[in-house]
Amino acid sequence: MLALADNILRIINFLFLVISIGLISSLLNTQHRHSSRVNYCMFACAYGIFTDSLYGVFANFIEPLAWPLVLFTLDFLNFVFTFTAGTVLAVGIRAHSCNNSSYVDSNKITQGSGTRCRQAQAAVAFLYFSCAIFLAKTLMSVFNMISNGAFGSGSFSKRRRTGQVGVPTISQV
């Protein structure tokens, strides 16, 4: 079973990623030209939901899935993907005012729409929120790996430290 703080961060991150998917899917639905930046953002959100939320649910109930090394790897990849997605979209929209018509008309992501501009800015914000949560979860995974080893889980290591696993001691006989 994963820690309570880890599960709370997973729930909050799930909400941020669902909001990001909604904003990005709206950008994809209203686009006139192809934008690989927006497509990558959708991939990063979908990958984050799949590996963080769904894998986290399974890791709560199936203890062999909760290896600290696997959780660290997935959290680190999610951090990298969401940071890259937020940065790619932020560079693409170049953080101008959405009321500036010359900027909105010339940008490949906003494509002449102030609404698309605001949606892209909101998607960048939620991607960075998600990125911060993935960074916190990566650090938690590192501390878990240091304390429990790369292939041990927290509950198994606690049982081993208290002497409940293996050969019984003389006081248990």
Curated annotation (Swiss-Prot):
Q: Does the keyword Cell inner membrane apply?
A: no
Sorted alphabetically, the Gene Ontology BP terms of this entry are: eisosome assembly; plasma membrane organization; protein localization to plasma membrane; protein secretion; regulation of fungal-type cell wall organization; regulation of phospholipid translocation; vacuole fusion
Species assigned in the record: Saccharomyces cerevisiae (strain ATCC 204508 / S288c)
Kindly name one Pfam family recorded for this protein. Answer: MARVEL
Per the UniProt entry, the signal peptide is none
Query: What is the protein's major site of localization?
Result: membrane
Its gene name is NCE102
Q: Which PANTHER family match?
A: NON-CLASSICAL EXPORT PROTEIN 2-RELATED (PTHR28165:SF1)
Give residue spans on the Cytoplasmic membrane side. 1-10, 63-75, 158-173
Which keywords, in A-to-Z order, does the entry hold? Cell membrane, Membrane, Protein transport, Transmembrane, Transmembrane helix, Transport
Which compartments is it annotated to reside in?
Answer: Cell membrane
**What protein family is recorded?**
Belongs to the NCE102 family.
- Cystine pairs annotated here are none
The name of this protein is Non-classical export protein 2
InterPro entries found in the cross-reference section: Marvel, NCE102-like
Q: What is the documented function of this protein?
A: Involved in membrane organization. Required for the formation of membrane compartments of CAN1 (MCCs), localization of CAN1 at the MCCs and subsequent invagination of the plasma membrane at the MCCs sites. Involved in eisosome organization and might act as a sensor of sphingolipids that regulates plasma membrane function. Involved in a novel pathway of export of proteins that lack a cleavable signal sequence. It may be an accessory subunit to an essential core component of the non-classical export machinery.
Which segments sit on the Extracellular face? 31-37, 94-137
Superkingdom of the organism of origin? Eukaryota
Keyword Transmembrane helix set for record? yes
**Gene Ontology CC, one term:** cytoplasm
